[in-house]
Amino acid sequence: MAFGTEPTPTGLADPPIDDLMEHADSKYALAIFAAKRARQINSYFTQLNEGLLQNVGPLVEYQNQEKPLSIAFREINSGLLEETLGEDDLTEGN
C-alpha cells in the first residue's frame, strides 16, 4: 500500500470524534444529537420528492448518495447546530 494514494476518509472518520466531542457533553449526547438531525435530513429528502417541505434541509454542501448521518456530523462540526436539552431530555430517567 503506497502512502498518499488512499482517498481521504469521510463519514464517521471525518470529522474526527475528538473534534465532534467539542460540541457535546458526552458520546451518548453526541450520538442522540446527530441521530435526531440525521432523521430530520432524511425526512427532508423524502418530503422533497413528495413536494412537501416541513423540515430544514442540509446546512452544508453534500454529495449525492451521502448518508444523512455524515451530513449531520459535518453540520455539528461546523458549528451550525447547537445541542440543547428539551424538557423530555431533562425528565428522562427520573
Swiss-Prot record:
EC number: 2.7.7.6
Enzyme class: transferase
Reaction(s) this enzyme catalyzes, per UniProt: RNA(n) + a ribonucleoside 5'-triphosphate = RNA(n+1) + diphosphate
Listed GO biological process terms: DNA-templated transcription
Gene Ontology cellular component terms for the protein in this record: DNA-directed RNA polymerase complex
Single GO term (MF): DNA binding
Record keywords: DNA-directed RNA polymerase, Nucleotidyltransferase, Transcription, Transferase
Record bears the keyword Nucleotidyltransferase: yes
InterPro entries: DNA-dir_RNA_pol_omega, Pol_omega/Rpo6/RPB6, RPB6/omega-like_sf
Family matches, as SMART domains: RNA_pol_Rpb6
Family stated for the protein in its record: Belongs to the RNA polymerase subunit omega family.
Subunit comment: The RNAP catalytic core consists of 2 alpha, 1 beta, 1 beta' and 1 omega subunit. When a sigma factor is associated with the core the holoenzyme is formed, which can initiate transcription.
Chain's role: Promotes RNA polymerase assembly. Latches the N- and C-terminal regions of the beta' subunit thereby facilitating its interaction with the beta and alpha subunits.
Protein name: DNA-directed RNA polymerase subunit omega
Organism: Bifidobacterium adolescentis (strain ATCC 15703 / DSM 20083 / NCTC 11814 / E194a)
Underlying gene: rpoZ
